[in-house]
Amino acid sequence: MLELAHKLADSDAKFFGGWVLAGAEAHIHQPAEAMANQVLLAKERKSIIRVAGAAADGSLAKELRVFLVLPKHKLGTKPLEPEAIKGDLLTKHTFTTQEIADYVAYTGDENVIHKGEHPIVPGLCMAAWLQRELALETLDWRITFVAPVYAGDELCIYRTEGQLAAYVGTINVFVIKEL
């Protein structure tokens, strides 16, 4: 996941200045020998970028599609509704500003929302952490990001039938459907 995020940062920088990750689809099946980016959609307030990694034989080894949006309102100003948590607690983690800074330095994700005193945890940083935490060498995920997670927030991951749900307190922040 981290090498896909690193390659994603090679995309045109205008897609990273204040834009937020609304969703992602990741397929990781084997190591990749070569990686390439492709902008599939570039509109005023939304963009889709694909990162594909080819295996030595030329087949698709891994792929990441990200759905980026430029919010109309400042992040964190829209009230979020608490909800009943479903599923069994799988794992939890509190991201530090140093972890976010390390991720940004490694991937090259220079988005301003991941910097400052109270940065937002990058969505792909959380996905990469979860992949490592679950010791997954292969995966097929569709991730929908619902609300931001900030440095210092305790992120709790719950497993339900066919999906993982992430919460900060009783606020659902993202859902991963296992494809």
PLM region spans:
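Short linear sequence motifs
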Residues: T96-E99, T138, T160
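Generic alpha-helix signal with a bias toward terminal, lower-confidence helices
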Residues: H73, T107, K115, R132, ...
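HotDog/MaoC-like acyl-thioester-processing domains
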Residues: M1-H6, K14-K92, V149-L179
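Active-site helix/loop of acyl-thioester processing domains in fatty-acid/polyketide metabolism
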Residues: M1-A32, E110-V112, P119-T138
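A contiguous, surface-exposed recognition patch within enzymatic or periplasmic domains that forms
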Residues: I85-P119
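A conserved acidic, glycine/proline-rich C-terminal tail/linker
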Residues: E133-C156
